[in-house]
Amino acid sequence: MFYTNVQPFGNFIALRGVDHNGVSFQKKLRYEPTLFVQSSKPQDPQWKTLDGKRVAGVKWGSMKETKEAVRQYGGEVFGLDQFQYSYISDNYPGMVNYDLARIKIAFIDIECSSEFGFPNIRQANEEVLAISIKMGDDFKTYACGDYDPPPHVRYIKCINEEQLLTEFINDWASNYPDIVTGWNSRFFDIPYLMNRIVRILGEKAANKLSPWGWFRENEVS
């Protein structure tokens, strides 16, 4: 059993992984993190900071309650404030034995028009002409117009960009990958595709790309 993704979700941990039977799962779990404060009690466990201060573990309730308690606490508080890592440490100690055969890896590539020059990622101003995605032995290409694909590629012919994006989203949501990769996908394909979907179909449609039904923007460099 191993995890593939752990994210904070309000007072919950959003967990995706593979169980002992090799089946993918996802669930939301309540989690109360442990942080550490200075202690002079001799009976406390021998936890120490890097500079030698003796500390004891404390629980202040839910993740939101813990963050509020840290703000109000008068002294130093030690530990991770990104609680997804605390959850991993608590529930998956030691080395995690991953089975790569059970991890769904999607390779993605998009093609855009360039009528007005190179597409602007933020504005998503150019039409998406094609999307190709390969996951395991399943290789699909979504596009408009006639195309004679190689034997190993399934071609989904669409009448316009709106249908192309919709077909892609529906297939994606029927079998969410664990890892998404591709050439320059982090800096172009994924952010451009997300912004283009929001522009053409709306944010509700873009939310379907997430197994949890929501997404947030991050600056990458």
Role assignments for model-derived ranges:
Residues 1-221:
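The two-metal-ion catalytic cores of nucleic-acid processing enzymes
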